[in-house]
Amino acid sequence: MEYMLTRLEWLVGPDKIQTLKDTSIALFGVGGVGGGALEALVRAGVGRIVIIDGDSIAPSNLNRQMITTHDTIGARKVEVAKARALSINPDVVIETHDIMYIEEKYPGFIQSLNVDYVIDAIDMVTAKLSIIEVCQRESIPVISCMGGGNRFYPEKLMIADVNKSHTCPLARVMRRELKKRGIKKQLVLFSTEKPTKPQFRGEATSPGTCSFVPPVAGFILAAHVLRTILEVSEQ
C-alpha cells in the first residue's frame, strides 16, 4: 500500500526512512529561504523540526515565502509554518520558538534543542554569527545561508566553505567577522551572481527579491542536510 514516503522509500530504502524519522533539525528563519527548507524537510519525513522565527507575515512576503497566503497575513510565522507542516505530514513533531535569537539574550538555547543539524536561514548578521559560534563550539553541524536578495539566477547558488565564497556582500562580511572570532571554516550557501542594482527603491531598506531564488536556496540547504543524514554520495 502506498503512503506519503513510498516514492522516497523506493529511492533510499526502508532503513533510511527510519533514519529520517529519528532525525531532529533546527531551522532558524522560516521566510523565503527557510520556508523552502521547511517544505523539503517535512516532505522528506524528518521526524522532528524545531522552527525559530520571531516575525509575523506581511503582504510583501507573498511574492516568495511558501508559508504565506492572503489568509495568513498578520499571523505569526512560526504558527503558520507549524500548521502547514502538520497539514503535509501529521506525524512530524514541530516545536516552535517565536523569538529573534541571539546567544546573549538566550544563553544555552541551541544546546537545549537537542538537534542533529542546524540550518541558518535568517538575515541578521549578529544572529548568524551567534548560531555559528555556538554550533561550532558544541560540535553541532550547521549550514548558513548567505545573501539571496537582488538576484535572478538560482542556478548560481552553490555550497562551499565561507572562505571560498565570493561575489556575495553578506558572505564578505561573514568571512571578516568569523575570522575575528577565530572561526576558520564554515559551510555556507552563497550565490556567484553579482547582485542586481534595484530599479526602484521607494522607502525600501531591504533588498529586492523574486519568487524563485529564496525558495530554491531553501531547497538546496535542505538537500545538503538530508544527503548528509542519509549518507548519500555522488555516483
Residue locations for each model-derived region?
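Glycine-rich phosphate/adenylate-binding loop
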Residues: 111-117, 122-127, 134-138, 142, ...
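Conserved N-terminal Rossmann-fold NAD(P)-binding element of oxidoreductases
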Residues: 27-29, 52
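N-terminal charged helix/coil linker that caps or initiates catalytic domains
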Residues: 1-25
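Conserved SAM/SAH-binding loop
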Residues: 98-106
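Glycine-rich phosphate-binding loop and adjoining beta1-alpha1-beta2 segment
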Residues: 46-89
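Hydrophobic/small residue at the entry helix of a nucleotide-binding pocket
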Residues: 33-34
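Conserved S-adenosyl-L-methionine
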Residues: 42-48, 137
